[in-house]
């Protein structure tokens, strides 16, 4: 086992990365190794998808499957070894079908990629785990060095984050053949184990640029189906009655669940990255979408244990449900998996609803506590002139984007302390689950404009980018000249690709934390600092002083 893709990875003087019987996320060595094997199979599939396009062959089933299966290897998504192997077998079957199509056009068609002919050696998981050792990401570290390995992983993990957003977009009917072509090209190239530093740096920027397009079509999918988010108050306390909790990012799953629970007497609560769903008109119209429950994903083993109803996980993040003994009432969807828990195939939530009706639910309603969400792209752009006016009248000094992933590390209290230390004449724009560090606190307003503005899920970084570009255009300056600072918390691969997106767009002087990615060497950190001004958090006082004086 070698996995260094998330922020909580093991860090020792001897090196970074989880390499024992179990990773910090709870992933076993078996599952981790089989995910490496799956990635190799997907690289072979992408290699033939690239070749097929040379013959004018585009298979949408392949284009849809490849990023979805890659998504299953993202942190806290799928811990179920047999399902991981199932994805690998499906990838190989699709690859062979593509290969046959190419050969039907050109009898001499061939693919030079080293992953292009990969076959699984056995049906036995132990044998497959031994085969997977050939594809451990750090297997040639001694030959290539830590810097090249770090850049390879930056590209692999960044592409993994983009693949997740591609799947979210596709679920909503949004896709782009040019994006698929670019994805396959990069995925296939990474399967050649590249070792050119400049080429890898260029690839990282290409992934960022590609992901900007992915976030654009994802934004289009969400707003076309569910309307543009508008500011909405959400209750974060319990309401009497039977209940279901839904977590993850998939708004379509939430919509289907709301449709199917309407009139049943079962209330629905959002959790984690589902919180922004309350801002969408077509979702909040359901009166039994009664509120948001819980806090950051890392607290779920305590909070889910206390929730008196079933729980549906639509995407990341799931952690061991046996710890809180709620594994008999947690349900996984799509690419999510945990051994032994119930998995929903298709869009029928009937079994979940039946379980909710058999459970007690909340015995009474608590005193409401309302927070505001729903500052989507349209709302943000509508406020651009107000922001400019406040800046011109020296009522608004600075905007801080404080957001990103949450996690268990104690150092993440930095982001709470930072948000509460922001001066009263400054605004806080937030997104993703890092907001749970401070989103239930009171921040007041500036001439009626809330000082805490919740822009949505992690992918809604797109809205923040569009706002920044609009403000810069109206003020006749560059984005980096705005009174705007980005203070980002990271945890997994979606955060990595959003960072690459920002860097590829030329955004500089981003501050990240609580720690640097474990695959970043001192040399790579120095390169990113020199090229982009990227740096790690220090202390709240020092960072605040530096950002306000920039």
UniProtKB/Swiss-Prot annotation:
This is Hydroxylamine reductase. It is found in: Cytoplasm. InterPro entries: HCP/CODH, Hydroxylam_reduct, Prismane-like_a/b-sand, Prismane-like_sf, Prismane_a-bundle. The modification Cysteine persulfide is found at residue 405. The gene is hcp. It catalyses: A + NH4(+) + H2O = hydroxylamine + AH2 + H(+). It comes from Salmonella paratyphi A (strain AKU_12601). Its EC number is 1.7.99.1. Catalyzes the reduction of hydroxylamine to form NH(3) and H(2)O. [2Fe-2S] cluster binds at residues 3, 6, 18, 25. Hybrid [4Fe-2O-2S] cluster binds at residues 249, 273, 317, 405, 433, 458, 492, 494. Its cofactor is [2Fe-2S] cluster; hybrid [4Fe-2O-2S] cluster. The lineage of its organism: Bacteria, Pseudomonadati, Pseudomonadota, Gammaproteobacteria, Enterobacterales.
């Amino acid at each position: 086992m070698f996995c260094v893709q998330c922020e909580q990875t093991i860090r020792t003087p001897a090196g970074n990365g989880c390499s024992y019987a179990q990773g910090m996320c709870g992933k076993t060595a078996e599952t981790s190794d089989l995910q490496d094997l799956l990635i190799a199979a997907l690289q072979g599939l992408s290699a033939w998808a690239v070749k097929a396009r040379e013959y004018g062959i585009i298979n949408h089933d392949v284009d849809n499957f490849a990023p979805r299966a890659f998504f299953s290897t993202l942190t806290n998504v799928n811990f179920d070894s047999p399902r991981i192997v199932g994805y690998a077998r499906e990838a190989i079957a699709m690859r062979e079908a593509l290969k046959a199509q190419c050969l039907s056009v050109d009898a001499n068609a061939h693919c030079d990629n080293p992953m292009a002919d990969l076959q699984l050696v056995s049906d036995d998981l132990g044998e497959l785990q031994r085969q997977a050792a050939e594809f451990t990401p750090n297997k040639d570290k001694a030959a290539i060095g830590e810097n090249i390995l770090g850049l390879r992983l930056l590209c692999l993990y960044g592409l993994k984050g983009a693949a997740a957003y591609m799947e979210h977009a596709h679920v909503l009917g949004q896709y782009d053949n040019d994006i698929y072509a670019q994805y396959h090209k990069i995925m296939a190239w990474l399967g050649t184990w590249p070792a050119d530093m400049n080429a890898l740096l260029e690839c990282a920027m290409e992934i960022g640029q590609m992901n900007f397009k992915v976030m654009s079509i994802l934004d289009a999918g969400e707003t076309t189906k569910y309307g543009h988010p508008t500011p909405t108050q959400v209750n974060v306390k319990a309401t009497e009655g039977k209940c279901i909790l839904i977590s993850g990012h998939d708004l379509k799953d939430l919509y289907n669940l709301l449709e199917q629970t309407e009139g049943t007497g079962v209330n629905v609560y959002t959790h984690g990255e589902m919180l922004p769903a309350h801002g969408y008109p077509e979702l909040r119209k359901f009166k039994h979408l009664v509120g948001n429950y819980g806090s950051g994903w890392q607290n779920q083993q305590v909070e889910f244990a206390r929730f008196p109803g079933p729980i549906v996980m639509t995407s990341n993040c799931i952690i061991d449900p046996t710890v809180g003994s709620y594994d008999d009432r947690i349900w996984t969807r799509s690419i999510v998996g945990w051994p032994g828990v119930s998995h929903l195939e298709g869009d029928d939530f009937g079994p979940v609803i039946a379980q909710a009706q058999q459970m007690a639910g909340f015995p009474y309603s608590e005193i409401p506590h309302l927070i505001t969400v729903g500052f989507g792209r349209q709302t943000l752009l509508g406020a651009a002139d107000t922001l400019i006016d406040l800046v011109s009248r020296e009522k608004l000094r600075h905007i801080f984007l404080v957001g990103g992933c949450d996690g268990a590390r104690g150092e993440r209290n930095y982001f709470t302390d930072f948000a509460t230390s922001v001066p009263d004449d400054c605004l806080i724009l937030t997104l993703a689950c890092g907001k749970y560090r401070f989103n239930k606190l009171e921040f007041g307003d500036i001439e009626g404009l809330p000082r805490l503005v919740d822009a949505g899920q992690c992918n809604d970084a797109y809205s923040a980018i569009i706002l920044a570009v609009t403000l810069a255009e109206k003020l006749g300056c560059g984005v980096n000249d705005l009174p705007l600072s980005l203070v980002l918390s990271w945890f997994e691969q979606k955060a990595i690709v959003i960072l690459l997106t920002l860097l590829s767009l030329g955004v500089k002087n981003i501050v990240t934390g609580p720690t640097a990615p474990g695959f970043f060497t001192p040399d790579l950190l120095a390169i990113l600092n020199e090229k982009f001004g990227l740096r790690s958090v220090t202390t709240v006082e020092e960072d605040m002083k530096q950002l306000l004086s920039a």
